[in-house]
Regions:
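OB-fold single-stranded nucleic acid-binding module
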Residues: 1-167
Length: 167
């Protein structure tokens, strides 16, 4: 569509500039305060849309594969490249991205190029973490275990003698 960026144009865009993309919903977080945070992808790349303006009615329509046009600003927070202050419009079209195996990219700088994509890691084993009492657990809510259900989940997995932390 006219005025819509390709993924390459989006990736090359400077931070804090307006971006317009068309992509497909691959996942979403819960609706809250007339906002939604969503993971989008097309055949060329992936996008993280942080707190897009969204009615509860439209939230229900954002099922996996739904095509949307997003207008917002490219930003970054804690290494996460995202589209902020965004609005969206639902379009015709559907695409569900296949999971890309990125196991071989663990521990490399190339992994960040797959940021926000639907990915899979294979052959990994959950490695225990320690809670505040020194007990081995499979995961923690918040980095230090001080959280509860609904907070960020931290867990470790190992492969070939290396341990990786996922959030």
């Amino acid at each position: 569509s006219e005025g819509v960026m390709t993924y390459a144009e989006y990736a090359a865009a400077e931070m804090d500039t307006e971006v317009v993309i068309e992509a497909y919903v691959q996942g979403k977080q819960s609706w809250w305060d007339n906002k939604v945070t969503a993971y989008l992808q097309d055949e060329d790349g992936a996008y993280f849309c942080y707190e897009m303006a969204c009615t509860e009615e439209d939230y229900a329509k954002l099922t996996q594969g739904t095509k949307i046009r997003v207008t917002g600003y490219k930003g970054e927070w804690a290494g996460e490249v995202e589209i902020m202050d965004a609005t969206f419009e639902i379009l015709e079209g559907n695409y569900v991205a296949p999971a890309t195996d990125v196991t071989a990219l663990l521990g490399t700088d190339a992994l960040v190029e797959k940021q926000n994509m639907f990915v899979t890691f294979k052959g990994m084993t959950v490695a225990p973490k320690k809670d505040a009492n020194g007990n081995e657990v499979a995961y923690l809510y918040k980095w230090d275990g001080s959280g509860s259900d609904g907070d960020d989940l931290y867990f470790d997995v190992s492969l070939n003698g290396n341990t990786y932390t996922f959030t």
